[in-house]
């Protein structure tokens, strides 16, 4: 039977000083010997997805105390990608993932915590905490802040649903009046919570359900709904149950590395592709797999992407559905249920929502709308929006008149009635990206699944934005933005502004964009990111010249620079001959802080999840 980790600092005469300090935090004599559960919160007033999390730790703590544990809460940083976007702040977004992972590890290991509850929500916070949890391998439950309600406004006598991307596109579109642009801006983000579409934050919170590390509804229940309160309480109860299973019953299935196994990563990827999740999820799944010491690679993602259909279509891929609609249709568990019926899911895997001796199949039996006979579950998934602007969690209790269990025409479809038999994400490869790149096919117009165009090359996102807004980019161009990868940026910026501006200029379906950077979960259109290797690491994207023909074929999973191998090799030799000036952007003026330089020094390309290069650390 494993000994409590916390005993290191709470038992024996030699720990009198540590116990004295524990007492100063409020612990009493009878608290020593109880499991100490760390609560990693990410409350901040900077981020709408986190502005309501201040009191969530107390909810979790109350359930832990009731179950016989001691909780100790700490906070991590949280960067808002939407606010950091379009300026130098975006350089810090992806590197913050590593800082969050490290800070959770530091706090948990320094204080010998026995288990962990991760209160996350937005883009890099959930992945950072996930990496830490798998690195630490102690009992863990994730519970997120939940998605915000979709914005709604009245334009031309019609009520339309909105999100952050709509505000950006409208503001850049000269045909939209100042009055309408202001209406959209004020309505796009009405409540606390992660942005309302299937962007990176919501995608990752859904994936924690599929990995088996969070409770049903975690990815879809609205931040504002009173039903979400129970998720925080249940997270506290569940982490205590897992803690007892591991430390008392010696049950290693309670540990995250045994829950988030290779099969679980396959499940998460299948979910991601079925729901057309953010392309950033690929980056984070690859990074998490490395922390879990699971040999899960881009090749596995490619393999799964070729057989999983697109079962759930959500903004930004359609204006019709947002996360509130996904929840009404049964959330992640109902998408997993459809994958199971299509024989595309492993159900013999552990899950934090499963009791001892159970697995995912038992969780689906309770929570998949097609299977369940439980009226309480159907009521749970009827939780809906109130349409009242607020920054308060649990501020409303509105319900849809019925759940959406229409698997032919609803938000979630069966395989037979899928939005498309091709999934929502695809891995492409070719001489531009020999180690792969990612496209969110859910957001690509059918007419653009194959595209041939001229290269319009930019050495930075800023230059690309200027070129798009200045009229340099025309229909038929393939916009190439390079030296924006993890090492070259550094920080692998998101390219939401270039794609939004292409849309606002009417070029969204007439141009393609490829980059060694990445895209916001809010991106749609023929946007291909994560080109690997990146330009700064000797990737062929650095060898593309103005006017080169680029051929993109999504059905064939290829992306090809239409020049001969000999010409490409000659360009490579010419670049190498530049010495220290080679594989660097031309004439780019960008301040890079010491912190970012340290990140760049160890960063790998996107095909490795943009994690640290361990070969440089292991000697």
Curated annotation (Swiss-Prot):
Enzyme Commission (EC) number: 4.2.1.9
Protein's name in the database: Dihydroxy-acid dehydratase
First-level EC class: lyase
Family under the similarity heading: Belongs to the IlvD/Edd family.
Molecular functions per Gene Ontology: 2 iron, 2 sulfur cluster binding; dihydroxy-acid dehydratase activity; magnesium ion binding
Pathway(s) of this molecule: Amino-acid biosynthesis; L-isoleucine biosynthesis; L-isoleucine from 2-oxobutanoate: step 3/4; Amino-acid biosynthesis; L-valine biosynthesis; L-valine from pyruvate: step 3/4
High-level lineage: Bacteria, Pseudomonadati, Pseudomonadota, Gammaproteobacteria, Alteromonadales
Binding site for [2Fe-2S] cluster: 122, 195
Catalytic residue list: 520
Subunit record text: Homodimer.
